[in-house]
């Protein structure tokens, strides 16, 4: 690896955490050399038989051949499964408990259907547009329907010379795309048409998620990546992106019937707590899995995810106790999610104390996000997608630029500048907010013109479980 001393390969210590200690130019050179999936060389043995004296060249080529570690493969498959657990059943139960009993199945169905749809779209064209080469803003169609992706092709990790089977990377990233779309549905729950959810999800995934993912994560060509933006596991790509889309949806779909006049309460906080717990467990795959290797970098992301979430849960509960006189279970569960969201962009580059600080700050501020800020915005964001994911993602993305500093325990390079990195992070946040906002407005307008957005008032009052899906969660 350029600019880094050689390490004992048996220790596998040259991991993703180390990658972020390099200068931006060095990071670009490494990724340029190893970014494209490669077929394993098959002609070396043939050449050795045909060309006398080829042994030395064969040894040199073998030494430079990409390494696939079975432990990494096992870890990444497990991480992929954990992200699936986050969505179904984690997110589904978290959202399902927050809505009224007459709408719980509709939310579960929306989460399941959106995740399933986007995973299929990811294989069809999403993967190639996000990671299949290309310029600053979008990829190419070179890998349409996974063209050229086989058991032999490899995807690079953050460590020079260490790779994963490309199928593993495709599967892992598909779950990220799927859960991002599913997050959005909470903002306009209890009043939107099912077919409108699916059409919007397809449009938004294509024109918002894929360009942002490419700009932030595809190196060295991605525009925000080239600027030096740090988003280890999806603070901008996933959470700000989804939060803004949810807020736009809350405005354009409109308020629920009776909002502000009738009591609209969660029907089962126990479901929500179970969902939050599953999200916390699954998030270790989301964050630590983003290291792409089972090394010390994954361990750091794992520990930071644990600490930030615990700090956020307590911070939310403390603020709630001060403001309302007592902490609530719903608040504790919401604090868990706020902490998970905020540490997502920073989990691989900040130290444990920085993670605690990020979690505590996010937990406290997101209480305001779902109360005071929500009143200021005057939007019926039913399940507080923007207040938790949007605001939490913004807090985490910005604080990544602070706590990555080595002086604060982070893994940044020796010449790391907080002021410079904070500016880059702010740019990344701004681009994501504007891009997702504009695409979301256009997508909702298209959906409204094609299939309509809302169910009829009578159907909404009866509940979407019966009127949209013909079934009820609770039989009387």
Label each residue range with its predicted role.
Residues 7-9, 20:
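N-terminal basic, low-structured, amphipathic or hydrophobic segments
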Residues 54-476:
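Glycine- and aromatic-enriched membrane alpha-helices
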